[in-house]
């Protein structure tokens, strides 16, 4: 699971970030689950919040207490004032929550399958 922007080529490199990851893990049975484009940030946040605790009080995503970075992100990441965009000014935050959010949004999306580009 990952950020679709990692598939972009940069003028400073002949390979994408995801090609580097794929080549590094070539000897392992890893399934690459990177979408062609990222989901809307709000959709991803809603999917994560729904897994952490939905309207019925169900908790379907539990975080191991050893996951200090993810816990810190969940406690401190917030939207920009008056916006639906995540505030990313602190470069030490959002990496762990973004990563878990990509997985949750793909596997437990609140949006129908046709949004995700699956052929039915």
Question: What would you call each of these model-derived segments?
Answer:
Residues 1-87, 110-111, 117-120:
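Mg2+-dependent endonuclease catalytic cores in nucleic-acid-processing enzymes, primarily RNase H-like
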Residues 90-111:
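Acidic, Mg2+-coordinating catalytic module of metal-dependent nucleases/exonucleases
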């Amino acid at each position: 699971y990952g950020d679709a922007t990692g598939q972009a080529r940069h003028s400073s490199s002949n390979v994408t970030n995801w090609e580097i990851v794929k080549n590094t893990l070539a000897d392992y049975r890893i399934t690459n689950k990177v979408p062609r484009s990222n989901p809307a940030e709000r959709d991803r946040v809603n999917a994560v919040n729904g897994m952490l605790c939905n309207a019925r009080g169900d908790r379907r995503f539990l975080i191991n207490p050893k996951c200090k970075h993810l816990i810190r992100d969940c406690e401190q990441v917030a939207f920009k004032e008056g916006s639906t965009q995540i505030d990313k000014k602190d470069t030490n935050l959002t990496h762990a929550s973004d990563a878990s959010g990509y997985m949750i949004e793909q596997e437990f999306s609140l949006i129908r399958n046709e949004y995700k580009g699956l052929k039915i």
